[in-house]
From Swiss-Prot:
Protein's name in the database: Acetyl-coenzyme A carboxylase carboxyl transferase subunit beta
Top EC class for this record: transferase
One example GO MF annotation: ATP binding
Signal peptide range: none
Domain of life of the organism encoding this protein: Bacteria
Species of provenance: Rhodopseudomonas palustris (strain ATCC BAA-98 / CGA009)
Complex formation: Acetyl-CoA carboxylase is a heterohexamer composed of biotin carboxyl carrier protein (AccB), biotin carboxylase (AccC) and two subunits each of ACCase subunit alpha (AccA) and ACCase subunit beta (AccD).
Family: Belongs to the AccD/PCCB family.
Taxonomic lineage: Bacteria, Pseudomonadati, Pseudomonadota, Alphaproteobacteria, Hyphomicrobiales
Length: 327
């Protein structure tokens, strides 16, 4: 029996584990329902039936927003990886390496430049899977670079926020990104360019105390947690019970903190419409949508395109002369 229990059974278990991928099924946090991962992925990471919005990676976000799933990865400034040589239970440098291996990203923010229903836009996405989307020096530089590019190209800037706050391992250098990004937002305003923020689950801490709540328009995904301090901290401070749904997207909309709550499937057309309205661009008609590729091929100069794929290299610079929105 010892041979059977100690040798044969573990081997059988290992075979079964190898044949079944870990992410084959996803459990809905709202209903507990098990859903096939591919179905959720094809549904933009929205659980069919319950409509629960799962977290979405940066690459998936950019694919869902840009025309033909095509964009240019914007080259971001290099920063010191571990300026304070911080260590808690583990070295901060080791945590950064693990996060980069897990996500394939350099840091928590990725910036892309491309077309949204034929209009040029700059999109920045915070990836919560990278150390909780925390705001550090690299993330701050990425956001500022994205806003500078929006000014250079005279294009709207769209920010997908998802963060637990400032990155504690970088100390005051992390907190400095709050005023720096706030100054960059002012730069967009002086250039009279739209700044649209999409608040996703969760958006908390120093991010909500800076650029995430300074947009011209604030959109929230259904059920997103949005706030500065956690609900338990607030309850302990004020010694009162908070209302149901406090800090959720719907509650914030009812109390005027966000402009609209938009389902993920409706985000792309909503963002395109807002960009057209704020830049006073003509609406995209069926005729122009059909004729645009032929006209572009006839008179436009050759323009490189990139379809982002996991693991595939992508150009790091935007095109020299993108089509500017019509006045």
């Amino acid at each position: 029996m010892n041979w059977l229990t100690n040798v044969v059974r573990p081997k059988i278990r290992n075979i079964l584990r190898r044949e079944t991928p870990e992410n084959l099924w996803i459990k809905c946090p709202d209903t507990g329902q098990l859903v096939f991962y591919k179905d959720v992925e094809q549904n933009q990471f929205v659980i069919p039936g319950s409509n629960y919005h799962m977290r979405m990676g940066a690459v998936a976000r950019l694919r869902a927003i840009f025309d033909n799933e095509t964009w240019y990865d914007v080259a971001l400034p290099e920063v010191v990886a571990d300026p304070l040589k911080f260590r808690d239970e583990r070295k901060y440098a080791d945590r950064i390496k693990d996060a980069r291996t897990k996500t394939g990203a350099h840091d928590a923010v990725r910036v892309g430049f491309g077309k949204l229903e034929t209009s040029p836009v700059v999109v920045a996405v915070q990836d919560f899977d990278f150390m909780g989307g925390s705001l550090g020096m690299a993330a701050g530089e990425a956001i500022i670079r994205g806003m500078e590019l929006a000014v250079e190209k005279h294009a709207p800037f769209i920010m997908f926020a998802a963060s637990g706050g400032a990155r504690m391992q970088e100390g005051i250098l992390s907190l400095m990104q709050m005023p720096r990004t706030t100054v960059a937002v002012q730069m967009l305003r002086e250039a009279k360019l739209p700044y649209i923020v999409v608040l996703t689950n969760p958006t908390t801490g120093g991010v909500t105390a800076s650029y995430a709540m300074l947009g011209d328009i604030h959109i929230a995904e259904p059920g997103a947690l949005i706030g500065f301090a956690g609900a338990r901290v607030i309850e302990q401070t004020i010694r009162e019970k908070l209302p149901d749904g406090f800090q959720r997207a719907e509650y914030l909309k009812e109390h005027g903190m966000v402009d609209m709550v938009v389902h993920r499937h409706d985000l792309r057309p909503t963002l395109a419409r807002l960009c057209r309205l704020l830049t006073k661009s003509p609406a995209l008609t069926v005729t122009t949508a059909v004729e645009a590729p032929a006209e572009a091929a006839a008179k436009a100069e050759p323009e490189a395109t990139t379809t982002e794929q996991p693991g595939a290299p992508a150009p790091t610079e935007p095109p020299a002369q993108p089509a500017a929105p019509q006045a």
